């Protein structure tokens, strides 16, 4: 069973992927589509090349539960808490089972209250929590995590999501233990297609995710990919404030686009596509392609130039050139880039792009070939990767264009279940009975500003210890 392929784009337009409104989520259904039904709709200028079964099947033919804000519902009367999953600056996440006719498993996110000074004061929800709740309430797509309901109880806010058994960080880690073995090429293709399909939907709804990374890409036990954690997502159509003024730091450092590293005050959905390119490379190599060290803010909360991260990108892609990126010289941190290029011992930075060599070494070391069981992403895979990791955000491929790329439209059809044909088994998500404080009325307070404190470095280390 395979996904249909979207037709070639008639033009780039803006990075909103041709969004003209919020009424028609652009994802493929069966051989026909209904514009008035968002669960089966498609953008009006898209048609199908191949007839396939509806994406609705990825929801197991179950209609989404009606969303509700429940202020009088008692959490523990409706859900049985199984255990603790993870924590972040926002709060904690727990696994739960439905009670009394509410079947299935759920992930419950409990938000910490904001704090003033050292004493916890219930000053309201953080901007991040409000954004996530409001966006998840409106969004509905098979490749975006589904919010079931939001519960307010004892001054705490709980978001109840569908439960997903895996995420890409867990899957990548599994393929490095006990020894490295490649993720099969058909699985990589399916994961990437579903990720781009969900991203196309978000962008068509004028939503920028701004924190795509393996840990935030969820996968169900039936191989359906869901984009999760919309805490840094932002509606970019006619924003009240500039994107930079609202959040000065977005996207986890290893997945941060060069325009962000160079201090862009205005940016587009292209930052999400750069992150997808980084995720694509990581699925193939089983390690981050640009693994830099993050420079922290000083006491004045000044955003530093991320020199080391920029260096990691240059070592593979070469120095960005004004001739190929016309807006480069207008970037606030362009003088810092010039200083890097002219510093003593910087000769190696002036070499041409090394991405193609990196790609072929990656395929060889991973055992990817046309005759191997894992298959190979081939030259089409490299072309797509190079278009995702394009320096100039105006030239970077969009989600819509990427879905029409030959990597997806030729060769083996894209499997709707990314685990299709995979003979191995991934371990279930770790659920701990320790540190399970969802029954308490409060949590240590926090204020979320920019990215979570538990960056990928610490999170990956923590996940590795737990698995």
Curated annotation (Swiss-Prot):
UniProtKB keywords: Activator, ATP-binding, Kinase, Magnesium, Metal-binding, Nucleotide-binding, Nucleus, Repressor, Serine/threonine-protein kinase, Transcription, Transcription regulation, Transferase
Gene3D superfamilies registered for this protein in UniProt: Phosphorylase Kinase, domain 1, Transferase(Phosphotransferase) domain 1
E.C. code: 2.7.11.22, 2.7.11.23
CDD domains to which the protein is assigned, alphabetical: STKc_CDK8_like
Bias type Polar residues, positions: 1-12, 29-39
Reaction catalysis annotation: L-seryl-[protein] + ATP = O-phospho-L-seryl-[protein] + ADP + H(+); L-threonyl-[protein] + ATP = O-phospho-L-threonyl-[protein] + ADP + H(+); [DNA-directed RNA polymerase] + ATP = phospho-[DNA-directed RNA polymerase] + ADP + H(+)
Cofactor(s) listed in the protein's UniProt record: Mg(2+)
Chain segments carrying region Disordered: 1-45, 426-467
Binding site for ATP: 85-93, 109
EC top class, as a word: transferase
Protein kinase domain span: 79-408
Any one Gene Ontology molecular-function term assigned to this protein's record: protein serine kinase activity
GO cellular component, one term: mediator complex
Kinase keyword on record: yes
Catalytic residue positions: 211
Subcellular localization: Nucleus
Oligomer and partners: Component of the SRB8-11 complex, a regulatory module of the Mediator complex.
Family, as annotated: Belongs to the protein kinase superfamily. CMGC Ser/Thr protein kinase family. CDC2/CDKX subfamily.
Function: Component of the SRB8-11 complex. The SRB8-11 complex is a regulatory module of the Mediator complex which is itself involved in regulation of basal and activated RNA polymerase II-dependent transcription. The SRB8-11 complex may be involved in the transcriptional repression of a subset of genes regulated by Mediator. It may inhibit the association of the Mediator complex with RNA polymerase II to form the holoenzyme complex. The SRB8-11 complex phosphorylates the C-terminal domain (CTD) of the largest subunit of RNA polymerase II.
PANTHER family: CELL DIVISION PROTEIN KINASE (PTHR24056), CYCLIN-DEPENDENT KINASE 8-RELATED (PTHR24056:SF495)
Name under which the protein is recorded: Serine/threonine-protein kinase SSN3
